[in-house]
Regions:
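Extracytoplasmic metal-acquisition and chelation regions
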Residues: 1-242
């Protein structure tokens, strides 16, 4: 694991021990789609070679967010794992890649991959039932991280606060987001634990709406597993949209 739990991949800067830890790696899995552009350089620094970096995102039917209120230019959301259907596809890709690298371990990877997919299928059915109360509700996020979850479970992401991760929105964009939050019916505003939320806090105050938190990255004590991550997102939606 290169990126420690709780860190924002957009701001990550490789440390010497991260480089050293990859020196003997046979395969490096990355998200791609602009989330971890440092992965290729990190592999080169470690002597692992670019060919050993396997980007998963481009294989997951990336979602292109629309222009307009969302941000001035289209953006691609790299957080494909928030959709359990794509997560199951990711398991298949991982099993195939690992089996190709280690053919003798193939039966083990396929067995474990099958068990994980069954768990994710059950999770998807659980959240699908839970999401019936959210149908067509509107959400505003700090940055573009919930388009896949929203598409899977019938939500509408109608605005993104930051035009790009870490970028300050313009006054015009802030005003448009405030208008969106005020409705009618008003959209729910979400920040994220890995990112600074001062702008989102100011927006919530200006619009007179609550500020909710959702974790699309996971890794912390409340989202240590994939299932906990998705259930955590679902709980956040329940708390904001019921």
């Amino acid at each position: 694991l290169i990126l420690a739990p709780g860190l924002d991949p957009h701001d990550y800067e490789p440390r010497p021990k991260d480089v050293a830890g990859l020196a003997d790696a046979s395969l490096i899995f990355a998200v791609g789609l602009g989330l971890d552009p440092w992965a290729q350089g990190l592999a080169r620094s470690a002597g692992a070679g670019e060919a050993r970096v396997f980007e998963l995102g481009p294989l997951m039917d990336p979602i292109l967010a629309p222009p307009g209120l969302i941000r001035p230019e289209p953006l691609i959301d790299p957080h494909f794992w928030t959709d359990p259907v794509r997560a199951q596809r990711t398991v298949d890709v991982l099993v195939e890649a690992l089996s190709g690298l280690d053919p003798e371990g193939g039966p083990f990877y396929r067995e474990r991959g099958g068990a994980l997919k069954r768990s994710i299928q059950s999770l998807d059915a659980e959240v699908s039932r839970q999401s019936e109360t959210w149908a067509r509700r509107r959400v505003v996020t700090l940055h573009g991280s919930l388009f896949y979850f929203a598409a899977r479970y019938g939500l509408q992401v109608t605005a993104v606060v930051q035009p790009a991760p870490g970028a300050e929105p313009t006054a015009q964009h802030m005003a448009a987001v405030v208008t969106e939050l005020r409705g009618p019916p008003g959209a729910a505003l979400f920040t994220e634990p890995q990112m600074e939320s001062q702008v989102a806090t100011a927006l919530a105050r200006e619009a007179g709406v609550p500020l909710h938190e959702v974790d699309a990255l996971g890794g912390g004590p409340k989202a240590a597993s994939y299932e906990e991550l998705v259930r955590g997102i679902a709980r956040a939606m329940d708390g904001a949209l019921r």
